[in-house]
Amino acid sequence: DLENDEQVWPVFLELTQDIGHKLRVHKKCADGVAIHIRDNTLFSKQWQTALDMPTQSPMLIAKAAFALFEKRYDWRNPIRSVTIQAINLVPQDTPRQVDLFMNIEKIEKAEKLDQCIETIRQRFGKDSIRNGILFQNLRMPCEKSEITMPTGMLC
């Protein structure tokens, strides 16, 4: 069970690595994120939020999901399971509207970095490059299960 925010953040980051990869493979961007939290009494809660702009970045998705988690989860009980979903998917070539306060150069630089990381992972394997925090003892199963929904979609 996860007992504090410091244990939850690496799990969010690990889960969003796969989300970012799948978004790139399917040429989609997420315009929102949803989290599903189940505590050790098996009580579940789900929340969702919109992102500032559509993205494929695992880090931006993880940060948005974690901000939502910190805002909504009250820590009555330890967490048994966490699910993160990219929602409101749009094609990756959809024009994005920026505002006056966005640092578009920083965003583009981060997107290029994410693309480079994705290229390295495709060439040398998905664990060839990782965030340093993910090398600590993650409180999640080593093997993630792949669930096939009745519609044929993979989760």
What are the roles of these predicted feature ranges?
Residues 1-155:
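Basic, low-complexity intrinsically disordered segments
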